[in-house]
Amino acid sequence: MPSFDIVSEITMHEVRNAVENANRVLSTRYDFRGVEAVIELNEKNESIKLTTESDFQLEQLIEILIGSCVKRGIEHNSLDIPSDAEHHGKLYSKEIKLKQGIETEMAKKITKLIKDSKIKVQTQIQGEQVRVTGKSRDDLQAAIQLVKGAELGQPFQFNNFRD
């Protein structure tokens, strides 16, 4: 029986490239001359830390980072951006978490979405991925289009397609 897996993964190499590109853009921006502004990647915690001198500049840093992430093929909704900034002395900072894997709650939403659509496929939650199995390729492709069309707040990839 044909099957595929729904996963949510980010390539850390691409994230590293996006952060380096954002730092390069930051060094050439006129409005950041003479300002202490840093974009750092922490690969262990899978997070990006933005630090600068004002709240407005912090929002500008986020825009620069999102722009370079999109250029590298990383969807902006795979970044978990907190709404409020931390304030330490004269510096403002935000720690942006990277969304890796599908949490159990999100996997249940995907399973419910597919089952409610009456497509003749079965879903199984397997750790941080959802396996979808069906009798025909057309049913699987319909399930892929359904998940792509749903606004679930996280990007998904479809891999391990077996016939």
From Swiss-Prot:
Molecular function (Gene Ontology), one example: nucleotide binding
HAMAP family to which the protein is assigned, alphabetical: YajQ (MF_00632)
Protein name (database record): Nucleotide-binding protein APJL_1242
UniProt-listed InterPro entries: DUF520 (IPR007551), UPF0234-like_C (IPR035571), UPF0234_N (IPR035570), YajQ-like_sf (IPR036183)
Alphabetic keyword roster: Nucleotide-binding
UniProt keyword Amino-acid biosynthesis, yes or no: no
PANTHER family: UPF0234 PROTEIN YAJQ
Keyword Nucleotide-binding attributed: yes
NCBIfam families attached to this UniProt entry: PRK05412.1 (NF003819)
Any one annotated GO CC term: cytosol
Protein family: Belongs to the YajQ family.
Organism: Actinobacillus pleuropneumoniae serotype 3 (strain JL03)
Biological function: Nucleotide-binding protein.
Residues forming coiled coils: none
